[in-house]
From Swiss-Prot:
The gene is ruvA. This is Holliday junction branch migration complex subunit RuvA. Has three domains with a flexible linker between the domains II and III and assumes an 'L' shape. Domain III is highly mobile and contacts RuvB. Residues 1-64 are annotated as: Domain I. It comes from the Bacteria. Residues 146-197 are annotated as: Domain III. It comes from Syntrophobacter fumaroxidans (strain DSM 10017 / MPOB).
Length: 197
């Protein structure tokens, strides 16, 4: 099993990269969060790797942080969530955001990710809730999201406008912090767009 790869970045695409390690090119599937942190082709890159073995293929999944890899490993334990869908989920949500979503049972946030329907979202919430512990520190400092309708409507509007899910969540969190709990959706969206400008 391969647990770590370090080598020269040969090719970079949004869903996979090729890492050259001593003349051997490894195709590694990565979430967008890892993709955006990668250096340019020709530079050295190091990734935490999960080796996924199927009957017909061996696939490598790479992550910049241990937290991303840990969350990926938790996601693929859920019935109906394969490695590709887990990478897709991590492309739209940070491990901290996903942790909070699971603890607070915010299925509507999961359903905003392409490929995650109602049943999969419910399974993720149900099967991972007991595996998540309440974190202290940074997690405790994050403001509680506004009521489901305001937050969900604003989040959906931002994603439809073309903002990346992680970018929209971060800005919404800041807007909620400055406006207070449960602001009207129009006010929340206006403040969030101001922060993103």
């Amino acid at each position: 099993m391969i647990g770590h790869l370090e080598g020269r970045l040969r090719h970079k695409a949004p869903d996979y990269i090729v890492i050259d390690v001593h003349g051997v090119g490894y195709i590694v599937y990565v979430p967008l969060s890892t993709f955006y942190d990668l250096p340019g082709p020709g530079d050295t890159v190091a990734l935490n790797i999960h080796t996924h073995i199927r009957e017909d293929a061996i696939q490598l999944y790479g992550f910049r942080t241990v937290a991303e890899k840990d969350m990926f490993l938790r996601l693929i334990t859920v019935n109906g969530v394969g490695p590709r869908l887990a990478v897709n989920i991590l492309s739209g949500l940070t491990p901290d955001d996903l942790h909070r979503i699971i603890l607070q049972q915010e299925g509507f946030r999961l359903k905003s990710i392409p490929g995650v329907g109602k049943k999969i979202a419910e399974r993720i919430l149900l099967e991972l809730r007991d595996k998540m512990s309440v974190k202290k520190g940074r997690e405790a400092e994050q403001p509680a999201p506004a009521a489901e309708s305001s937050y969900g409507d604003a989040y959906s509007a931002l994603v439809n406008l073309g903002y990346r899910p992680a970018e929209a969540e971060k800005a919404l969190g800041k807007a909620i912090k400055s406006l207070g709990a449960d602001p009207p959706v129009e006010k929340l969206l206006k403040e969030t767009l101001r922060l993103l400008a």
